Amino acid sequence: MMYHIPGVLSPKDVARFREQLEQAEWVDGRVTTGAQGAQVKNNQQVDTRSALYAALQNEVLNAVNQHALFFAAALPHTLSTPLFNRYQNNETYGFHVDGAVRSHPQNGWMRTDLSATLFLSDPQSYDGGELVVNDTFGQHRVKLPAGDLVLYPSSSLHCVTPVTRGVRVASFMWIQSMIRDDKKRAMLFDLDNNIQSLKSRYGESEEILSLLNLYHNLLREWSEI
């Protein structure tokens, strides 16, 4: 399943990020890519050795960790260190698949269950640059407002189309979920959403408490932590 997570960053935060990223040191994006991805990748990334990068990636982590919808959809166990990329002048990233595991500075290794892209450019400010994701439901083309995030299974083939006008800047990361299976995670997300909707409409009740108990028992049964 693919999820649109709106408002991870406020417009004020996005503007500040963009201003700081204009001063960043950018390097060839292939430095963080395996052999397969390097053949089709043509973009730039913020140098991870810079002090600015360290500050910005911490802000992204704080923002997603405080976003209730992100937590409900991803049920995160481990988040990768966020990275930042830039596309301009027909730069693109052809179809590829993300690696199944990645190194992690604290945990050693993490499994990539979900991929996330946090858009930092106004979609009207550039042409092209759509994130295209192929999954069992077909092909999806994603180009979200600045500050919004998209979550999708890391097992999906995906690409970024050429940016033919303007500049596309984004942050991206991977998530190891407490729930490895996409279908089980999607069922828990739907159950959680319906519980919250019923609670807001009717208030607390024995039936809602029973559903909440079911949610947590399923999470207890399926989670890997």
Swiss-Prot record:
Keyword Iron applies: yes
EC number: 1.14.11.-
A single GO BP: intracellular iron ion homeostasis
MF term (GO), any: 2-oxoglutarate-dependent dioxygenase activity
Keyword flag Metal-binding: yes
Domain Fe2OG dioxygenase as annotated: residue spans: 78-177
Residues the entry annotates as binding 2-oxoglutarate: 168
Top-rank taxon, per record: Bacteria
Keywords in alphabetical order: Dioxygenase, Iron, Metal-binding, Oxidoreductase, Vitamin C
Cofactor note: Binds 1 Fe(2+) ion per subunit.
Gene3D superfamilies for this protein: q2cbj1_9rhob like domain, Rabenosyn, Rab binding domain
InterPro entries: Oxoglu/Fe-dep_dioxygenase_dom (IPR005123), PKHD_C (IPR041097), PKHD_hydroxylase (IPR023550), Pro_4_hyd_alph (IPR006620), Pro_4_hyd_alph_FE2OG_OXY (IPR044862)
Cofactor: Fe(2+); L-ascorbate
Binding locations of Fe cation: 96, 98, 158
NCBIfam families per the UniProt record, alphabetical: PRK05467.1-1, PRK05467.1-3, PRK05467.1-4
Name of the protein described by the UniProt record: PKHD-type hydroxylase YbiX
Originating species: Escherichia coli O17:K52:H18 (strain UMN026 / ExPEC)
